[in-house]
């Protein structure tokens, strides 16, 4: 490795398996270029970079961002349920079970 190359990790997880791949790229490569260089797109055909969000160390970023040496690039899966809708359903269930006030929604 020359001083113009950087070490990165590319991570992707499914409920039943995950991958953490190491890749060496030239300094100045973008997140998208690093993901493609890692080969992870060939291992997981469900990844669509035009739709998937990505991040570096658990902070979302753009595909055009430039990572630093030692960064972990993460590819995020879309949410299965809308968080607001899921919370509303839990609150309704709590009201029905008597664990929440039917008017205010607070604890009974």
From Swiss-Prot:
Residues 86-108 are annotated as: Disordered. It holds the Pfam family Ub-RnfH. InterPro entries: Mopterin_synth/thiamin_S_b, RnfH, RnfH_sf. Gene3D superfamilies: RnfH-like. Belongs to the UPF0125 (RnfH) family. This is Protein RnfH. It comes from Pseudoalteromonas atlantica (strain T6c / ATCC BAA-1087).
């Amino acid at each position: 490795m020359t001083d113009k190359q950087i070490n990165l990790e590319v991570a992707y997880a499914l409920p039943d398996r995950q991958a953490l791949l190491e890749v060496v790229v030239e300094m100045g490569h973008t997140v998208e270029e690093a993901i493609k260089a890692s080969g992870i797109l060939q291992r997981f055909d469900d990844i669509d970079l035009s739709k998937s969000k990505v991040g570096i160390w658990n902070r979302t970023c753009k595909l055009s961002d430039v990572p630093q040496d030692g960064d972990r690039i993460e590819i995020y899966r879309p949410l299965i349920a809308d968080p607001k809708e899921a919370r509303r359903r839990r609150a309704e269930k709590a009201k029905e079970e008597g664990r929440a006030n039917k008017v205010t929604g607070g604890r009974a």
